[in-house]
Amino acid sequence: GVVELSMNNGPVNTLTSDALFGLRDCIEQLSNDQTVRAIVLSSPFKVLSAGLNIKEARTFDSAQQDAIVRGLNEGFLALYACPKPVICAINGTAIAGGLFFVLTADHRISTPTAKFGLAEVRVGVDFPMGPLEIAKATLSKNDARRLMLRGKSVDAETAKNMGIVDLIVAADDVLPQ
């Protein structure tokens, strides 16, 4: 059937290396489960994911930095390569690393009030290679350049025009879709 993976690291679903390695392991397990036909990514919060906790990331030692980069690479590449259809139910903001949940999905359904962006340039954080390759593969060169270099978010309608979002529906209809 359809499996819903609900991110539950509220209030903004910040990314941690443990969560990203857990995502990788979960996706690999679901990929090999013959009873799973599709995977839905969702969040019970007003934010799909805001990416890393930058204040916390600035205090990482080299081992923690290596772990988060490996987690970002392995977690998002597993999601991107998943052989099952992945649907992202976007009920709110997907910024920085959080946008990669959207970009790795095969079908992306959003509320009209959702915001999307890559804010790394605003806080001086580099893109790990895996997410960078996903952005290059899923966004036009101009859209990737604009999102990465400006660091500003776009609304759902603009995201739809950019191909980030496939469908915009009322908030109550995001998961049922």
Regions found by a protein language model. Name each.
Residues 21, 35, 42-77, 94, ...:
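Glycine- (often His-adjacent) and acidic-residue-rich active-site loop
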Residues 26-29, 71-83, 89:
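Catalytic-core regions built around general acid/base machinery
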Residues 80-177:
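Crotonase-fold acyl-CoA enzyme core
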